[in-house]
């Protein structure tokens, strides 16, 4: 099946149909903004200069009434999909030769012929379709093929409506009026339907109907989710588009065979039947007492006609269609005749509900087509199927209710029937509906129908309500108040955040355990729909298996039912959904408790797509047999089926971490832009690194404090990057917003921490005293340093992680999950290994502090490991050896700690102590990275952030003291130009060369510059100095922005793409005169140098120099002219800003301060729009 072609057709058909239906409405004087009054005549009416017949006026009135009842857009959408459904249904029937006339309506059997066969065969089928031959002949004589086709199409739909009334309602209303024109033209929906989808894809594959529907609504679905991101809740009209997801066929087969199939085989074992169901899972070997329980539960009296199967969210009927196939097998082996089976299945076995009218139509049609595939005579009389789209009772007047009740009915029951279905499309099949006296109500319906035949005036007034609406309510109430042997579905996935208030309140009131998501609500509803001893099968989101918010639902199902089987699918099950968005599981439950039942769980999460998962299932890979009631011993009742027996024992026999310690989640500011800064952004004298408590912090009168915000995966030490504003003013504000400062008694305490969200393993590290923790940086204190270290060692082990993975196998390590890790006594065993733990911490700290983005940075590794060497290449080798040794030592330490914990927990058969290299968090030497960081350190020394005469951070606010820079002078004016040639003696390249000379030596200068250039990927035609200049000109600032997480501290003045002018300024040394100084001392100087260089090229061009020299001079002149022009234009920008004398406040952070110099509006004269320009390079 070519799903790309199917999707392309469906998506384009929706837009074409909507546009065409809108055009037809326009011709009738109806648009979204107005409804015109028609000019009426005796035999018709005219509007927009077009004449219509009198009966069309009544149709137009019904259309207007519908628009007023709903709205214009919804009615246009409904008419469009009605015709879409009819077109695809007729196409399916004609290709499979199911049309009663045997003549194709939309296409021709003759290859290459565009005109449908029905046009040429019209007189032969006139009687079958009740065609008026006078109309046919007139249209033929007038050569109106399009009109003839529309006439035949409408008659064909009406005729099909006699055998499939739910799919083809009689066309005599506004849908006929809005039937699009030009249906046979090139590019029309009908022509595209025939040409774009291969005929083979229609043959005996009724699932194509479901795919067409899903793709048809895909754009609408995208619109709904785009609105959801804008906090627009999902309305009842949009619930179908938001929640429809077509289930892969093999998963449907698993669900049906292991619920419906199992129901039959448990009491009627049959090897032949079982062999036909290749997704049926044979029962695992059970203990004798379990087998005894199972024997007692068998229902040997069950006959095929007794079985009832419900899909409460049937969509386009995919699951019910396969249930039909399985039921057919059951009937066959029970000895029924093949001719009678399809009708029995439709009328006795299958039930379906949905809130989407169009999907329900297609489900009905799919079942009829499935029945037709088994019995060619199935269309000989209308069948009443037990499927329906849930209808609302809104708007039924009291007079109609009174009339319906009459003298014979219980008014309370009819009132209940009406009331329970008010706004029912809001809730769908989750509505709790009671059984009432349907026999008496249906008897009254017959009386009213007989009165209708004698034209009772009162009943005529409410004929639509009495003869159409109330029967629909009765039908759906009967289905929804019954219980079934098998209930199976792919429920809608909709989190409570997307629900509107009405739906959210209903879910909270009636399905509290599952209120977080509609799929969980449907799990509970399916359970309610099921008979005792019956089966429930769903495919839904795996989150219910693990997340703490579904703890109650897990406990409920583990206590009240038996998991018969499960395929844990993970992501990639639905081929049309990419990434990790939908992570699924499919399962079968028995609504009866069978203690110690051994359940097969199949783990398919590691396979990438649905096809791979299917093959693994069939090859019987990744199977785990577990008694699911053991999960009741797991804290939180997680479905930890892939835990080994010893792991499950550890859960059941030990205390959990939360029994002994109290891990906490920290604060959420509610406004990070206001309260959080990266530590390098602010004035260092306004940071308090050592507060002991909240009162101590406030007494210091200092604003900024270290803040633990989680961060990427890292163990032992690190991720110290943020500060939080926590003075008294900020504290008072934070106490009232965000999450209102939870666990504040623990702020500034030492302990351990981990990131709540990560892309890897759990990484636990030190939480330094003086730090406040965030909701993303969870916190735990054991009360003393020794126990903190022990806990950190355990939580960083693969033992702790394997337990945590069973508790919650997502990338979120919530406090509640960590609380549930089983904790054995191991402190005494670790006493002798304390040196291993402290070694891990010190190695990780040394690594973290070797990079200038750490507030513990002292000196660059190229200088720390210099010893007496004067060659950078040798120093890099020393550093590389040291980093490798540290890496290997940390790896050995972690593996030894793993070995200890594996032994403590007796998991030698389940785990090995090895740690993958990718999971060791410290960095090995990297020539390019380390040389670039050496260059960054050099720039820091040039601008005064660092000094060769003093360790650590020397200046980041306060008074600048030039006496701290003796060995290598910091730039006096805080401005370092970056140019593409040596225009300034103190440009950045000259200063860097001087830095290399000072830190290493004059003798090895050229060798060291060559080594640096090599690390920067020097080009073949470059000198080392040219390579270094190119790096500063093109890449240094990009690397700086990346290193400082888009919060650069060295700001780049940048004239534009021609590199006319660039200069670096250190943010912490900026003052109101800096911009003016850049302009007068550097930009203007450079402009004069460009002018001089251009003049020099002019002299050469007028001389008798060689052609080669002149060509080069001309090229250089053109470049210089572009740079000069760019500088002149930039001068306007810099002059405008210099005059403003902008001040910055470091407390505001880089983002706010940088923006003051961007998007500057330059006046362009009266009546002209100001020109926007940037002073600084974009970040």
Curated annotation (Swiss-Prot):
GO terms for molecular function: nucleic acid binding; site-specific DNA-methyltransferase (adenine-specific) activity. It catalyses: a 2'-deoxyadenosine in DNA + S-adenosyl-L-methionine = an N(6)-methyl-2'-deoxyadenosine in DNA + S-adenosyl-L-homocysteine + H(+). Its EC number is 2.1.1.72. GO terms for biological process: defense response to virus; DNA modification; methylation. Keywords: Antiviral defense, Methyltransferase, S-adenosyl-L-methionine, Transferase. Pfam families: Eco57I. Induction: Part of the brxA-brxB-brxC-pglX operon. InterPro entries: BREX_1_PglX, DNA_methylase_N6_adenine_CS, MethylTrfase_TaqI-like_dom, N4_N6_ade-DNA_methylase, SAM-dependent_MTases_sf. Disruption phenotype: No visible phenotype during normal growth, BREX no longer confers phage resistance. Belongs to the methyltransferase superfamily. PglX adenine methyltransferase family. BREX systems (bacteriophage exclusion) provide immunity against bacteriophage. Part of a type 1 BREX system. This system allows phage adsorption but prevents phage DNA replication, without degradation of the phage DNA. Methylation of bacterial DNA by this protein probably guides self/non-self discrimination. When the brxA-brxB-brxC-pglX and pglZ-brxL operons are transformed into a susceptible B.subtilis strain (BEST7003) they confer resistance to bacteriophages SPbeta, SP16, Zeta, phi3T and SP02 and partial protection to phages SP01 and SP82G (these include lytic and temperate phage). This is Adenine-specific methyltransferase PglX. It comes from Bacillus cereus (strain H3081.97). The lineage of its organism: Bacteria, Bacillati, Bacillota, Bacilli, Bacillales.
